[in-house]
Regions:
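Conserved H-D interstitial segment of serine endopeptidase catalytic domains
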Residues: 28, 34, 58-59, 76-79, ...
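Extracellular regions of mammalian proteins, primarily the fibronectin type-III
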Residues: 69, 74-75, 129-130, 146-148, ...
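Chymotrypsin/trypsin-fold serine protease catalytic domain
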Residues: 21-33, 104, 131, 136-138, ...
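Extracellular/periplasmic catalytic domains that process cell-envelope and extracellular macromolecules
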Residues: 46-51, 70, 86-88, 107, ...
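C-terminal subregion of chymotrypsin/trypsin-like serine protease catalytic domains
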Residues: 2-20, 71-82, 92, 184-190, ...
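Acidic glycine-/aspartate-rich tracts in secreted/extracellular proteins
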Residues: 81-85, 97-102, 137-142, 170-173, ...
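Protease-domain processing segments flanking chymotrypsin-fold serine proteases, especially trypsin-like
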Residues: 2-77, 91-98, 276
């Protein structure tokens, strides 16, 4: 991977280096403190600035409504239920590099949306096929520590029993207000059998959905469309987009996510090859 030093910045009186990453870069967290242990959103902890460089804030009329992830220099992936009711791209704004939902740091950038593609088999009743793509009007010219794409999973990866991260500005409890700062929470990827037992009455299709464990942690209002990600040891710990936050029963009891690997062919038919 080529990394080119391009400029030296002074931030809060301290020197920091801005790095320009190749366009095939994905799933890195250059600013993470390597000594940090995983945190134990509902039950989560505030992320550090720049910890999750693919996470975006989707805005409508200036207000955060959903999360999403950068998957290349011009496309965002999110949940279909975030945009299904209003598919006019002109009403949305995508904000990248954001930590403080109310006050943007100087590296934060925003983009208008050119087009929206909702999965043709999305059901607003069952939330099946809860996946959508948003094309930005202007490309992201340069990947930096603060915004770069997430990696995609391979088709045969299940990640069962591995620790995953849900990231967003969602409410800390049911009925609560959005968080001001980006939060992260960890939970285990459940096996398909445990997932089906947890949500009865045929609510789960393991071929296209994945579940995370509860333990008083999970996504809530405002986290929808955001990433559920796992560090992949087979790829030097790069972070892989396993799921898109879709739904749950209340808050703090894990969640149900759209299984990204199940839609890889559909995604690539719209945006071209994904990064993995």
């Amino acid at each position: 991977m080529g990394i080119k030093l391009i400029v030296v910045l002074s931030i809060l009186g301290q020197c920091a280096f801005a790095i320009d990453y190749d366009k095939d870069t994905c799933g890195l967290r250059p600013l993470i403190n390597k000594g940090d242990s995983p945190p134990k959103i509902v039950g989560g902890v505030e992320a550090e600035r720049g910890d999750w460089p693919w996470v975006i804030s989707m805005r409508r009329n200036g207000n955060h409504i959903c999360g999403g992830s950068l998957i290349n220099d011009q496309w965002i992936i999110t949940a279909a239920h975030c945009v299904y009711a209003n598919q006019n791209p002109g009403v949305y704004q995508i904000v990248l590099g954001l930590h403080d939902r109310l006050i943007a740091d100087n590296w934060v950038i925003s983009r208008k949306v050119q087009s929206i593609i909702v999965h043709p088999q999305y059901s607003s009743q069952s939330l099946s096929n809860d996946i959508a793509l948003m094309k930005l009007v202007d490309k992201i010219d340069t990947y930096t520590e603060y915004y770069m794409p997430v990696c995609f999973p391979r088709a045969n990866q299940t990640f069962a029993d591995q620790i995953g991260y849900t990231v967003g500005w969602g409410a800390p409890f049911h009925g609560g207000s959005l968080l001001r700062y980006l939060y992260e929470v960890t939970s285990s990827v459940l096996t398909d059998n445990v997932c089906k037992a947890r949500y009865t009455s045929g609510m789960i299709n393991p071929a296209t959905q994945i579940c995370s464990g509860g333990n008083s942690t999970g996504a809530c209002q405002g986290d929808s469309g955001g990433p559920f990600i796992v560090s992949d040891p087979q790829r030097d710990g790069r972070y892989v987009l396993v799921g898109l936050t879709s739904w749950g029963i209340g808050c703090g009891d894990g969640g149900v996510y759209t299984r990204v690997s199940a839609y890889k062919s559909w995604i690539e038919s719209k945006v071209g090859p994904t990064l993995s």
